[in-house]
A protein has these predicted regions:
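Short, low-complexity disordered leader/linker segments with a strong preference
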Residues: 1-29
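Early extracytoplasmic/lumenal segment of secretory-pathway proteins
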Residues: 22-92, 337
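Extracytoplasmic ligand-binding site segments that recognize negatively charged/polar headgroups
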Residues: 35-42, 61, 77-216, 248-250
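A ligand-binding cleft/hinge motif common to bilobed small-molecule-binding domains
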Residues: 88-92, 212, 217-237
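An extracytoplasmic/periplasmic, membrane-proximal ligand-sensing/linker region
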Residues: 183, 291-337
């Protein structure tokens, strides 16, 4: 039986041993916060875990909730990586100091400069194009040209749009501010609102369904929504048109990821991020959601490639975040709800 003196000596040692085991990284796991749906991301995590033996523990939630959670957790966060959609969200997380810069040759080679943070705090993993859709029964393709042209009187009562409350149209307007200046961009948005055939819709699918039903003739959507509808209805009476060709190019955005500032398992997070930007994962990622791979060495899914090639906007996608506050204020002034 231990006497009092021995207990006093042993207790600090036991306490130190206990504390040293708390909050320490697990070499066989990586923790990911993601706003991507389970069916779009879990197959990738499973494949990587099978190859490496490293388990991926992930939490799925809305991007805003995940960013707030990272903020609240601070240095005690268990998260090693944040994966989310839209460069605006990634920019915001970086602006809050939630990421750390990553200097990795493989990542820099895999992800083009305009699809990643200038300070390498986050990297694009897939590319989503936001372009025009139209009714081939009521619109001649020759009538179509640019996003800006949809503000012209010829489209009065013919345009459908998604609500401005979703980040996708905020990012589009942010890039317009960067290219055109605030005054001209606002004129365009006011023209859009004046040309609406109906109230704005909650999502891109509803925009295309309205076009198919004859409620309007033209709209602006992310192409993967078009691909999903087309997969379920090959006879969908809606077509894609690549906007701003020979001009600024089609507006593109990303889904992407960054390693968190206080990542407990940084090495595992870097290995996962590097793998996600590589050819195997890029092919799977793009096919799962009918998006474009960020890595230019990887071909698009055949269903996506069938839509044809297009010239994309070369602006760095970080503009979507840097100009987002201005874009939201502009849209509000213009009556775009």
């Amino acid at each position: 039986m231990l006497n009092g003196k021995r207990v006093l000596l042993v207790l600090p040692l036991l306490l130190a041993a206990f504390l040293s085991g708390c909050g320490q990284p697990d070499r066989d796991e990586v923790v990911v916060y993601t706003s991507r749906a389970d069916h779009l991301i879990k197959p990738l995590f499973d494949a990587w875990s099978e190859q490496t033996g490293v388990r991926v523990r992930f939490t799925t939630d809305q991007e805003g909730a995940l960013i707030s959670r990272l903020q609240a957790e601070g240095a005690n966060s268990p998260a090693d990586m944040l994966i989310t959609v839209d460069a605006g969200n990634l920019w915001y997380a970086a602006d809050l100091g939630l990421f750390q810069p990553v200097e990795d040759e493989a990542l820099l080679a895999a992800v083009p400069a305009n699809l990643r943070d200038p300070a390498n705090q986050w990297f694009g993993l897939t590319v989503r194009a936001r372009t025009l859709v139209y009714s081939p029964e009521r619109v001649d393709r020759d009538e179509l040209s640019t996003y800006e042209a949809l503000a012209e009187p010829a489209w009065a009562g013919r345009l459908c749009l998604r609500t401005s409350r979703k980040v996708y149209n905020q990012s589009l307007v942010a890039t317009m501010i960067e290219r055109l200046g605030e005054q001209q961009a606002e004129q365009v948005v006011r023209g859009w609102i004046g040309n609406l055939a109906t109230d704005v819709f909650a999502n891109d699918n509803s925009v295309m369904q309205a076009i198919a039903a004859g409620q309007c003739d033209v709209g602006i959507v992310n192409t993967y929504y078009y691909g999903r509808l087309l997969r379920n209805n090959p006879d969908l009476p809606v077509k894609l048109f690549w906007a701003n060709q020979g001009d600024s190019g089609v507006h593109v955005n990303i889904s992407g990821a960054g390693i968190t500032r206080h990542a407990p398992n940084r090495d595992n997070a870097l290995a996962l991020l590097r793998w996600l930007a590589g050819e195997e994962a890029q092919s799977k990622l793009a096919a799962l959601n009918l998006e474009y791979p960020a890595n230019p060495a990887v071909d698009s899914d055949p269903a996506v490639a069938a839509w044809g090639e297009f010239e994309a906007d070369s602006l760095n996608v970080e503009v979507a975040g840097r100009r987002q506050v201005e874009a939201v204020k502009l849209m509000d002034r213009a009556g775009y709800r």
